[in-house]
């Protein structure tokens, strides 16, 4: 009798585990929405210029935060550019490093800009931030590359990405 009960309980457990394994697990939904350049303009009223030789260009938005993003590859490196409405200067990059070698007295278009670099010997992260005061838009462009990026000019790529809202800068 004990053997029969053990067999029945084992069979019930197997059925339960099988049912659980076949039930899809609901996770947190991805808040990022893949879109197009036109979709960003329609939904958020912002646009990126795509650098001429860029490949694998992907647009997405975090609509609840009015955050637009463009990922692309250029000359063997991966980049992430972002735009978000803002009333003041803020870091929207999502890159959390101890920035060294910062540069502050320059512009992207006619916008005040900041650039920083962080390196750990194996990889180097570069970030450029700029703020277009008139429309109230904060911009960021970042990349992480292997090794030393000496001589690399992220600001030149930022100029290619920036689409002035007020016309030519």
Indicate where each model-derived feature is located.
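A generic helix-loop boundary/linker signal
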Residues: 3-4, 30, 151
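Surface-exposed amphipathic alpha-helical segments
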Residues: 137-169
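Short, solvent-exposed recognition patches
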Residues: 23-135
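Generic detector of isolated residues embedded in canonical secondary-structure elements
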Residues: 12, 53-57, 160
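Short beta-strand element of the conserved SAM-dependent methyltransferase core
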Residues: 13, 129-131, 141-144
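Soluble, non-membrane globular domain cores that form compact, hydrophobic packing
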Residues: 13, 24, 166-169
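Sec-dependent N-terminal signal peptides of Gram-positive bacterial secreted proteins and lipoproteins
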Residues: 1-22
């Amino acid at each position: 009798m004990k053997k029969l009960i053990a067999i029945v309980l084992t069979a019930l457990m197997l059925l339960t585990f099988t049912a659980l394994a076949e039930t899809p697990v609901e996770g947190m939904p991805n808040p990022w929405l893949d879109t197009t350049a036109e979709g960003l303009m329609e939904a958020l009223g912002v646009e990126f210029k795509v650098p001429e030789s860029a490949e694998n260009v992907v647009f997405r938005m975090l609509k609840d935060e009015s955050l637009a993003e463009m990922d692309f590859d250029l000359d063997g490196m991966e980049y992430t550019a972002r735009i978000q409405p803002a009333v003041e200067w803020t870091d929207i990059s999502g890159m959390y490093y101890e920035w060294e070698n910062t540069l502050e007295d320059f512009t992207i278009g006619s916008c005040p800009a900041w650039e920083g670099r962080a390196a750990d010997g194996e990889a180097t992260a570069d970030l450029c931030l700029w703020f277009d005061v008139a429309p109230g838009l904060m911009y960021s462009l970042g990349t992480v590359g292997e090794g030393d990026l000496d001589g690399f000019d992220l600001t030149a790529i930022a100029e290619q990405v920036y689409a002035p809202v007020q016309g030519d800068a």
